[in-house]
C-alpha cells in the first residue's frame, strides 16, 4: 500500500513536471539584436543605399518604428533597455568614456549598471528561460557586475564599448597603471588586448583574424543549439560591435562601394537618404532637412585626395552594415532550421546615433588622436584593415542620420531617434485585431519599452521597487504588446512625459512634442527649444513662441525630473568629445 501511494506521488510529480515543461516550451523565444552606432538612415528599410535584405524582410514581416528613441550613447541605452528604468536610477547617468568631473562619485553616475537595476535576463532566467549573451557588455567590468552576475547563464564577448574587429585589440589606451606610467614619462601608451570573457572568466580569443559580428553570431547560435531540445524557451541578446569604430571589414565587403561614396560625397548621400525616407513614409513628405552644423564642411571644399580618403571611410562603414545584415540573416535561417522562427520575437535596434567623434581629427581628446596616429596606418590604401583605426566623423555621421539634427552624444533626433524593427511571434500577428505584417508606425516609443515588452511576452512580473531585500529602480517603460494586438491606439498617451539628460543636455518628449536644450560646449545655445518632432524630425522649426503654454509646462516637468533624479549641473563650456579617455 505504501508503495502504491509513493507511485501515485511520483506519477503526480511527473505529470506536474511535464505540464510545467509544456507551459515553458509554449512561451515565445525572444531575440534582441543591437547594431552599434548604426545611424537612423543606414539600413534599407530606413532609406539607405546600403543593401540590407534581411532587415528589410524582418520589417516586411513585422512592425517598423520610425519614431523610436534611445539614448545618445551606448551603455546608457543598454542600461535602460535591459532594466526598463531611468538611466540615472541605475548608475548610467554618465558615459564611462567621458565622465563630467563634477559627477565623479555621485550616486547615479557610477558609469556601470548598479544593483539598483534588475535586468530582464535575471527575471526571465528565474522564470525558466535559458538566457544567452554574445557580443559587447559595456555595463560593468568588476566581479558582481558581469553578464553572468546579471542573469545571463551563458555569455561570450568583451566588456568594453568596442575593440578591433579582427583581433580584439583595444580601440583606446588601456585605463591602467601602464598607461598612467607612460603618460607620466611623456611616452605614448601601447596597444593592449581587450580581454575576451566567457561566463565571467577571461578566456583565450580563439577567433583572432575572424570578424567580430561573425564571431558573435556563431557563438549565440552555439548557445541556443546546445539546449535547443530541453523544452525551455530562450532569451538571446546579441549586442554586435559593428558598426562601431574602428571602421574595419574584409575588403570584399566594401571594395565595390568606394567609388560611389567618393563620387557622391556626404552632402549628396545625406540629401538622397532624406528624400528616400520621405518617399518611404519614414518621415513626413513636407519635412525640412537639418541645416549644416558648425562641425561639418561642404564635400566640394575637400581636395581630390581628401575625398578619396573620406569616401573610403564611408564605404567601409556601409560594408560593415551589410555584413551585419548577413549575420541577422544567419540567425534567422538558424531559427527556421530548428523550427523556432514562428515562435520567436526578433527585435533589431541601434543603441544611438552614428559616431561623430573623429579619432584622427579635432573633435577628440589629444590623447586619443596622438595614440591613434602613432599606432595605426590610416593611409587611404590601408583603411579598413586590422592595423587601421578611423571613425565616421561629423560629416558622414550627419549623412548617416539621413539629415536629422546632430548625432551620437547629442540629445537631438540624430543622436536618439534610432531604427527599431520587431518581428513578433506568428501567433500574435494572427490575432483578429493585431497589426498587420509590414506595418510602419510613427507612434512615439522609447528604449525602456523594450524591457516592459520582454517581460509581458514572457508573462513575468517586474518586482517593482524591491528585489531580494534590496531597493531597486522601477520600470518606467510600457509594453508594446497591447499596441501590437490592436488593444490601444498609441504606445504612450499624449500626456505621458518622457524626460532624459546626458552631458548637461536635457530633453522631454510628450506626444508629438519635444523640448531640448544643448549646451554651448556641445555646439548649442544652452536655451530650451520646442519642436513637433512627428512633423519636424530634423528639429528646424522652434515652436516655443507659438505655443508658450505647452513650452513652459514641459520645461517645468523636466525641472521636476531633474530635481527628482539629483542631476548634476554641467559647465556650459564642457565638451565630452575633448574629454574621451
Q: What does each model-identified segment do?
A:
Residues 93-126, 138-255, 264, 294-319, ...:
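Formylglycine-dependent
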Residues 143-151, 248-249, 333-423, 430-435:
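Histidine-centered active-site microenvironments of extracellular/periplasmic hydrolases
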Residues 24-28, 35, 39-40, 64, ...:
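Long, internal low-complexity/basic segments
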Residues 154, 158-166, 172-179, 386-415, ...:
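C-terminal cap/loop subdomain of S1 sulfatases and analogous C-terminal strand-loop tails that border
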Residues 41-47, 70, 77-80, 90-95, ...:
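Short, solvent-exposed loop/turn and secondary-structure capping segments
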Residues 1-22:
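Gram-negative bacterial Sec-dependent N-terminal signal peptides
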Residues 48-80, 84-88, 128-132, 150-159, ...:
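Short, structured active-site-proximal loop/turn typified by the sulfatase FGly-forming signature C/S-X-P-X-R
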Residues 24-63, 126, 137, 259-261, ...:
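Active-site-proximal N-terminal segment of extracellular/periplasmic enzymes that hydrolyze or transfer
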